[in-house]
Amino acid sequence: MNPTSFIYDKPPPPPIINKPFEQTNSSASLTQKNSSSETENVGRHGKRRMDQDLSFKPTKRGSGRGRGRSFRGGSHAGNTRGACAVDGIEYLKRRNISINTPEEIEAWIQERKKNWPTESNIRSKQEKEKVMENLGAADTSQSIDAQPTPSQHPLAHHEPHEKRGPPKKKSLYTKLLNTQLEQENIFFLQFMKLYLKKMGMVVKPVS
């Protein structure tokens, strides 16, 4: 018998084929692992609400809805021209103004021209103001000149009131000094009375 020859006692094993039930088992094991990790996280960081969606992701700051009125501008922060156009359309809708035909557009322009600062409008406004001044009407405008400045306001330079606290306690030195001064004053008054009596001067009590 040739030693190099090899005799197979058993047939070779069949090739491994991934069956569908094995794939489902692997996916189920992955979901079980994820759920177990989530329950561990919930146990560490406190209870999670039952009605909260696990796939919920918080929105970024400043990405709120609205026409550029969020914290950082929103989605329409740079598009101010379109926002102004939309605001103008909404204004017209609220005022029930329709400018669909050329006649309506022309009428709307003529109506707006009445308030334009032309020379005739300025002249008529000045005449109305003069008439109101002659009638003695008070000026209720909110201009800068009509309002007093902080330096002209009467309470601008008013000193704040000092808070009343408990009386200060006198030290022993001040008490002794006060008693000594009182005694010296009494002695001086007695000396002046005796001196005036000796000189023949009458001392009348002050009424």
Swiss-Prot record:
<feature type="region of interest" description="Disordered">
    <location>
        <begin position="140"/>
        <end position="169"/>
    </location>
</feature>
<keyword id="KW-0539">Nucleus</keyword>
<feature type="compositionally biased region" description="Basic and acidic residues">
    <location>
        <begin position="156"/>
        <end position="165"/>
    </location>
</feature>
<dbReference type="GO" id="GO:0005730">
    <property type="term" value="C:nucleolus"/>
</dbReference>
<feature type="compositionally biased region" description="Polar residues">
    <location>
        <begin position="21"/>
        <end position="40"/>
    </location>
</feature>
<protein>
    <recommendedName>
        <fullName>Uncharacterized protein C16C6.03c</fullName>
    </recommendedName>
</protein>
<dbReference type="GO" id="GO:0005634">
    <property type="term" value="C:nucleus"/>
</dbReference>
<feature type="compositionally biased region" description="Polar residues">
    <location>
        <begin position="140"/>
        <end position="152"/>
    </location>
</feature>
<dbReference type="InterPro" id="IPR019496">
    <property type="entry name" value="NUFIP1_cons_dom"/>
</dbReference>
<feature type="region of interest" description="Disordered">
    <location>
        <begin position="1"/>
        <end position="81"/>
    </location>
</feature>
<feature type="compositionally biased region" description="Basic residues">
    <location>
        <begin position="58"/>
        <end position="70"/>
    </location>
</feature>
<dbReference type="GO" id="GO:0180023">
    <property type="term" value="P:cytosolic large ribosomal subunit assembly"/>
</dbReference>
<dbReference type="GO" id="GO:0000492">
    <property type="term" value="P:box C/D snoRNP assembly"/>
</dbReference>
<dbReference type="Pfam" id="PF10453">
    <property type="entry name" value="NUFIP1"/>
</dbReference>
